[in-house]
Swiss-Prot record:
Belongs to the bacterial ribosomal protein bL31 family. Type A subfamily. Keywords: Metal-binding, Ribonucleoprotein, Ribosomal protein, RNA-binding, rRNA-binding, Zinc. It comes from Streptomyces avermitilis (strain ATCC 31267 / DSM 46492 / JCM 5070 / NBRC 14893 / NCIMB 12804 / NRRL 8165 / MA-4680). One of its GO terms (molecular function) is metal ion binding. GO terms for cellular component: ribonucleoprotein complex; ribosome. Its cofactor is Zn(2+). PANTHER family: 50S RIBOSOMAL PROTEIN L31, CHLOROPLASTIC, LARGE RIBOSOMAL SUBUNIT PROTEIN BL31C. It comes from the Bacteria. This is Large ribosomal subunit protein bL31. Binds 1 zinc ion per subunit.
Length: 73
């Protein structure tokens, strides 16, 4: 490898919105990374499914087409 052409490789603190944090190494100069999901809270790793706001879509569909249209399927 050539000298003095590679970015600085520093310890980086990664923190998730769930509160979990861990240390890794990265070329990010700030030394901190904020993530929305991590292995502590991601549904694939936890086995739990997050409920998204799909209830509004279903209610809007039923209001528009009625419950009979949904029951025919």
């Amino acid at each position: 490898m050539k000298r003095d052409i590679h970015p600085e490789y520093v310890e980086t603190q990664v923190s998730c919105t769930c509160g979990a944090s861990f240390t890794t190494r990265s070329t990010i100069s700030s030394g901190t990374v904020r993530a929305e999901v991590c292995s502590e809270c991601h549904p694939f790793y936890t086995g739990k499914q997050k409920i998204l706001d799909t209830g509004g879509r279903v209610a809007r569909f039923e209001a528009r087409f009625g419950k009979a249209a949904a029951a025919k399927k």
